[in-house]
Amino acid sequence: MKTNLSSQITLMRIPTRYYRPENAFEHSVLTRLEKVPTSIYESMDDGSFAVAKEIATQIRKKQETGKTFVMALPGGRTPLGVFKELIRMHEEEQLSFRNVVVFVEYEFYPLDSASGIYSRLKEEFFDHVDIDPANIYSPDGSMSKDAILDFCQQYEQNIQAVGGIDYMLLGIG
């Protein structure tokens, strides 16, 4: 089975006007029937930059009001470009993650090694920004089966306690 096929999609046969409208009218014509707003970019890098820019804007808005920005993150390869751009913004544009709370969306179960989703996110993202480790919540892939239901209920309560999720980044894979 081939993987990472989404990075090989090219838009050479699709006229630009179908994915990059020139004005608000064209945009409304293209999106009026969408139930979920969708943007199409020519490359994964372009899409990653746009998503990271949107996340950074929302983080900064919450910082201005002294509030916490809550996001849920996946593992895998899909978000790596977004993480790379957020790290760049942290290093070059002083984007701070001190007011950010993260909920890791899932974890392997049973976790039989230290190479779970949380470990990968830590290596690929958390270790490169100034997020407080106490603000990172992750499912525990090593708990007993009897404890899973209670843990999941507590995880939901933790999400509610911080006001819900502001931004959820999902993987495609």
What is each stretch, according to the model?
Residues K2-M71, K145:
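N-terminal glycine-/serine-/threonine-rich phosphate-binding loop
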Residues Y19-K35, L95-Y167:
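Ligand-binding beta-strand-loop-alpha-helix segment within the catalytic cores
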Residues V70-P74, F103:
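Short glycine-rich or small-residue beta-strand-to-loop segments that form or flank ligand, phosphate
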Residues L73-T78, L170-I172:
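Glycine-rich beta-strand-to-loop/alpha-helix junction loops that act as flexible
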Residues L86-E93:
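Active-site catalytic pocket residues across diverse enzymes, especially alpha/beta-hydrolases
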